[in-house]
């Protein structure tokens, strides 16, 4: 796990201390965390056979859980246990997905509780579709990223107020601003402080 800074920009009002597990170089490339794409289960078949990657959903979920257990244990030592874990919602309204397509959120919730964090994975719920940004060509099924999109398309819990929050996403890409906007939304909702963690960081 490595530390970096998400810098303030036109979307985010302050720098945010952040962490990531490994580089994300592209599906099928050497040493890439391909399990992140498999966990999304976009095809709904519980298996991925694409760009030389052949993996079942269950195997991908186990890989993800192992990484989260390792890294969040370290973050508990760095940030303390008095932290609430929140997760970036998927791009479409949550009720548009099958349970098997929401495994990232489920695993983050499981690991958070196992390590003694407050489970806030239900504190940000997408209710309006936005564009799918992880695909090579964005799926035009909703609004593209813009300042304030999180508050416009999600319900944010009142429980955010006053909390120290670690926001988790699967992949961080600097130019997209989805994570920056969500961090700002948490601050606007009264979070005491915010940190960020991603499994993969796009290079």
Residue ranges and their predicted role:
Residues 151-152, 172, 177-179, 197-203:
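Accessory, usually C-terminal, subdomains that scaffold auxiliary metal cofactors
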Residues 84-85, 115-125:
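A short coil-to-beta-strand element that immediately follows conserved catalytic motifs
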Residues 159-167, 171-172, 180-188:
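Long C-terminal interaction/binding lobes of large macromolecular proteins
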Residues 183-203:
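A short, conserved beta-to-alpha structural element at the edge of catalytic cores
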Residues 86-88, 168, 197:
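Short hydrophobic segments within beta-strands
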């Amino acid at each position: 796990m490595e530390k970096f800074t998400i810098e303030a920009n036109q979307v985010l009002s302050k720098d945010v201390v952040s962490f990531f597990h490994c580089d994300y170089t592209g599906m099928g490339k050497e040493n890439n965390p391909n399990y992140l794409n498999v966990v999304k289960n976009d095809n709904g078949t519980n298996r991925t056979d694409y760009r030389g990657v052949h993996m079942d959903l269950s195997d991908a979920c186990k890989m993800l859980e192992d990484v989260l257990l390792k890294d969040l244990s370290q973050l508990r030592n760095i940030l303390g246990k008095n932290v609430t874990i929140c997760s970036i919602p998927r791009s479409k309204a949550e009720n548009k997905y099958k349970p098997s397509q929401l495994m990232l959120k489920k695993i983050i919730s499981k690991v958070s509780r196992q390590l003694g964090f407050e489970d806030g994975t239900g504190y940000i719920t997408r209710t309006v579709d936005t564009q799918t940004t992880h695909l090579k060509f964005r799926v035009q099924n909703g609004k593209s990223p813009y300042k304030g999109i999180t508050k416009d398309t999600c319900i944010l819990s009142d429980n955010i107020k006053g909390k120290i929050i670690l926001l988790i996403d699967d992949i961080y890409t600097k130019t997209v601003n989805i994570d920056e906007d969500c961090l700002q939304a948490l601050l606007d909702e009264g979070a005491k402080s915010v940190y960020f963690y991603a499994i993969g960081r796009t290079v």
